Each structure stands twice: as structure tokens, then as C-alpha cells.
Amino acid sequence: MMVGYPLFLKLEGKQCLVFGGGKVATRKIEALLKRGAQVTCVSRDFCQPLKNLAKTVGATRRVAPTLQLKQMKDNRIVLNGAQLVIAATSDRKFNARAAQVCRRKKVLINVVDDPEMCDFYVPAVVERGPLQIAISTSGTSPLFAKRLREEMEKIIPPSTGKLLKKLGKIRGYSK
């Protein structure tokens, strides 16, 4: 397995598609919305937390994040202009077909719990204001990445975010 190239994507206003309506899909959608993405979630069923999330989406930003829940009526895979796709279903065959369609259309896809089918991995992230530290095992052991993130969160105090914001202002004055 080739090691990935680490980068941070600006997802504000970008069309993202998530297949699946369970707890894992909900977590992925929450992370996308936090970054201002326009999310469409397609599934046969939606868990209650996801339905609740759909009712509360709409922060005050330049481009507000959106969430649309669409009922899947058949197994067709329609990307509708999505720029990023996450397949979070329990149907491995569907996920594999979604990956094939995305590759054909040159759209990046993450297939949850199947690193071989992924074009990108979603890292465990430590966030302290503008500080973001991404931890990835390239899909080898997400549990290890999660545990390392938890340890780093203990080490890096929440006040780090405030400090960085002050340093950013100082940097602005020194330009």
C-alpha cells in the first residue's frame, strides 16, 4: 500500500455526497458540515440522530453548510456533481460499485473500513482553534490513530487555540 499525501481540503461550499444513513455516516456528515460543505446523504433508511441533524443544519457563514437527505429508491449510483464522496454503507458490493463510478468520473471517494478502495483517508484530528493536527495510519489501524489523538488532546491544552489567534494578529502587524 502506498502512503498518502497529507493535505487539508477547503470544503466550504463544495458538493459532497455520502452514501449510508447510520451512525458512521452521521459522524462523517457532521465533520463535512463543520467545514461548510454542501452535503447530500443518500440511503434507504436514516438513523434518528441523522434525521435530527438534518433539521438543525444552517450555520451563519459566507456559504452556509447544507444537508439534504434523499431516499435511495434503487441501487443506481448518481453523483449529481459531487466533488467528494464517502461510502458508509454496510453493503460492500454497493460500496465497490460506488468506488468504480467515482473513479470513472474522476471524483475522490472514501469507502469506510475498506482502505484498498479509498482514494483518501479521513484522519483522526486534534483541533485547538486554528491548530489542526491530522493523524493517519493510512487505513491500517484507525483505532491506533484515535487513541493517539486522545493522548495528544490531553497534552495540547485547549488554550492553544487562543494563543494561536493572538500570534496570528501579531503576524498581521509584522507584515
PLM-predicted stretches and their roles:
Residues 1-45, 50-53:
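Hydrophobic, well-ordered beta-alpha structural blocks that scaffold small-molecule cofactor pockets
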Residues 11, 78-80:
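A short, aliphatic-rich alpha-helical micro-motif
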Residues 39, 69, 106-109:
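Hydrophobic beta-strand scaffold residues
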Residues 54-76:
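Intrinsic disorder/low-complexity segments
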Residues 82-89, 120-139:
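Short basic, glycine-rich beta-strand/loop surfaces that mediate nucleic-acid
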Residues 84-89, 95-121:
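ADP-ribose/adenylate-binding Rossmann-like module
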Residues 139-175:
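An accessory alpha-helical subdomain
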